């Protein structure tokens, strides 16, 4: 179901909606480019978001990009736990709406 081979089909998106696809890819590249925040940290943030949205493609892409940017397994592990803490914290704080 979730084969990375599916990402090869993204080229069809560019053919069917070239202007929007070009704008999206330019935005994506600019957002993740080296800047005030180093690329490694941007990729770790992207990995946390991917874990939160539970997109298997995004997880794999940003895991590899984080490694390529110099992230260690220990850094990725801490990123996993930060993500888990925030997801759990959101459930707890949203639970306050249930209390009278």
Feature map (PLM): residue ranges:
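Acidic, glycine/proline-rich low-complexity segments that act as flexible tails and inter-domain linkers
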Residues: 1-43, 67-68, 94-100
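Generic low-complexity, intrinsically disordered sequence content enriched
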Residues: 14-17, 48-51, 85, 90, ...
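Membrane-helix exit/interface motif
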Residues: 31, 60-63
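Immediate flanking context of iron-sulfur cluster ligation sites
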Residues: 36-53, 73-80
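Basic side chains
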Residues: 40-42, 62-63, 87
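Short cysteine clusters
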Residues: 55-58
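Amphipathic, hydrophobic secondary-structure cores in small proteins
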Residues: 62-70
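C-terminal structural segments of small proteins and small subunits
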Residues: 72-100
């Amino acid at each position: 179901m979730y084969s990375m081979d599916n990402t090869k089909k993204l080229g069809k998106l560019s053919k069917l909606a070239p202007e929007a696809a070009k704008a999206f890819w330019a935005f994506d590249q600019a957002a993740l480019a080296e800047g005030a925040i180093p690329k490694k940290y941007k990729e770790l943030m992207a990995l946390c978001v991917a874990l939160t949205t539970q997109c298997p493609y995004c997880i794999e892409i940003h895991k590899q990009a984080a490694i390529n940017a110099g992230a260690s397994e220990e850094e990725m592990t801490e990123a996993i736990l930060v993500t888990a803490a925030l997801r759990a914290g959101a459930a707890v704080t949203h639970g306050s709406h249930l209390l009278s």
